[in-house]
UniProtKB/Swiss-Prot annotation:
<feature type="compositionally biased region" description="Basic and acidic residues">
    <location>
        <begin position="1"/>
        <end position="44"/>
    </location>
</feature>
<dbReference type="GO" id="GO:0030016">
    <property type="term" value="C:myofibril"/>
</dbReference>
<protein>
    <recommendedName>
        <fullName>Non-muscle caldesmon</fullName>
    </recommendedName>
</protein>
<keyword id="KW-0963">Cytoplasm</keyword>
<keyword id="KW-0206">Cytoskeleton</keyword>
<keyword id="KW-0112">Calmodulin-binding</keyword>
<dbReference type="GO" id="GO:0003779">
    <property type="term" value="F:actin binding"/>
</dbReference>
<comment type="function">
    <text>Actin- and myosin-binding protein implicated in the regulation of actomyosin interactions in smooth muscle and nonmuscle cells (could act as a bridge between myosin and actin filaments). Stimulates actin binding of tropomyosin which increases the stabilization of actin filament structure. In muscle tissues, inhibits the actomyosin ATPase by binding to F-actin. This inhibition is attenuated by calcium-calmodulin and is potentiated by tropomyosin. Interacts with actin, myosin, two molecules of tropomyosin and with calmodulin.</text>
</comment>
<keyword id="KW-0514">Muscle protein</keyword>
<feature type="compositionally biased region" description="Basic and acidic residues">
    <location>
        <begin position="62"/>
        <end position="76"/>
    </location>
</feature>
<feature type="region of interest" description="Disordered">
    <location>
        <begin position="1"/>
        <end position="83"/>
    </location>
</feature>
<dbReference type="GO" id="GO:0005516">
    <property type="term" value="F:calmodulin binding"/>
</dbReference>
<keyword id="KW-0009">Actin-binding</keyword>
<keyword id="KW-0597">Phosphoprotein</keyword>
<dbReference type="GO" id="GO:0001725">
    <property type="term" value="C:stress fiber"/>
</dbReference>
<feature type="region of interest" description="Myosin and calmodulin-binding">
    <location>
        <begin position="1"/>
        <end position="63"/>
    </location>
</feature>
């Protein structure tokens, strides 16, 4: 009878250990999934921020275009004054 009780308690303990292992495994999987989703979200937000920022080259190009436009207008004004 004692060995039968020991056998049941061992199998019960093994089942509990298996259940605990499964719970821990599922918890880790859920955490990994949540971290991956959060990382994707952060990367997407970072990409959107980068798209919103004007590129440094484009600012310089715009400034050069503005200066050229101003010079062209000044040249036309000078020509019109001469005529």
């Amino acid at each position: 009878q004692t060995s039968e009780k020991e056998g049941r308690s061992e199998s019960r303990q093994e089942r509990q250990e298996l259940e605990e292992t499964e719970i821990v495994t599922k918890s880790h999987q859920k955490n990994d999934w949540m971290e991956a989703e959060e990382k994707k979200k952060e990367e997407k937000e970072k990409e959107e921020e980068e798209e919103e920022k004007p590129k440094p080259g484009s600012i310089e190009e715009n400034q050069l275009k503005d200066e050229k436009t101003k010079k062209d207008k000044e040249s036309k004004n000078i020509l019109s004054l001469c005529l």
